[in-house]
Amino acid sequence: MFSLPGYEYFLGFLIIAAAVPILALVTNLIVAPKGRTGERKLTYESGMEPIGGAWIQFNIRYYMFALVFVIFDVETVFLYPWAVAFNRLGLLAFIEALIFIAILVIALAYAWRKGALEWS
């Protein structure tokens, strides 16, 4: 039989990781109510009767703030490993990180100047 020594725990983890979500979905299919009555089709709105339609337009400003947040969140993901390995990387990596931060600061200044961060 094919055997990889030391990988038994990993194989067990993979089996459990695949079995738990499948078991949860199957349990939901068995236990969940089947019928969709009129009251169950209504949109839930803090326990009150829904007012207006469920589809509303959001201001584009929400998307702009979300985009700026994602950009700086990704910056954190890239800078954290660099900060952890800072002592071993040397001067070239430090200069590269400074260039990366400078590009992001320029992008932030551009967004600020264009009014993307203004809430009006």
From Swiss-Prot:
User: What is the main EC category here?
Assistant: translocase
Q: Which domain of life is it from?
A: Bacteria
Its EC number(s): 7.1.1.-
| Segments traversing the membrane | 10-30, 64-84, 89-109
Record GO cellular component, one term: NADH dehydrogenase complex
Localisation: Cellular thylakoid membrane
Task: Give the membrane topology, semicolon-separated if more than one.
Answer: Multi-pass membrane protein
* InterPro entries associated with the record: NAD(P)H_OxRDtase_bac/plastid (IPR023043), NADH_UbQ/plastoQ_OxRdtase_su3 (IPR000440), NDAH_ubi_oxred_su3_sf (IPR038430)
Its UniProt entry gives the catalysed reaction(s) as: a plastoquinone + NADH + (n+1) H(+)(in) = a plastoquinol + NAD(+) + n H(+)(out); a plastoquinone + NADPH + (n+1) H(+)(in) = a plastoquinol + NADP(+) + n H(+)(out)
One GO term (biological process):
photosynthesis, light reaction
Q: Which UniProt keywords apply?
A: Membrane, NAD, NADP, Plastoquinone, Quinone, Thylakoid, Translocase, Transmembrane, Transmembrane helix, Transport
Q: Which terms does the record give in the GO molecular function aspect?
A: NADH dehydrogenase (ubiquinone) activity; quinone binding
Q: What are the disulfide bonds?
A: none
Q: How does it assemble?
A: NDH-1 can be composed of about 15 different subunits; different subcomplexes with different compositions have been identified which probably have different functions.
- Similarity comment: family membership: Belongs to the complex I subunit 3 family.
Q: What does this protein do?
A: NDH-1 shuttles electrons from an unknown electron donor, via FMN and iron-sulfur (Fe-S) centers, to quinones in the respiratory and/or the photosynthetic chain. The immediate electron acceptor for the enzyme in this species is believed to be plastoquinone. Couples the redox reaction to proton translocation, and thus conserves the redox energy in a proton gradient. Cyanobacterial NDH-1 also plays a role in inorganic carbon-concentration.
> What protein name applies here?
NAD(P)H-quinone oxidoreductase subunit 3
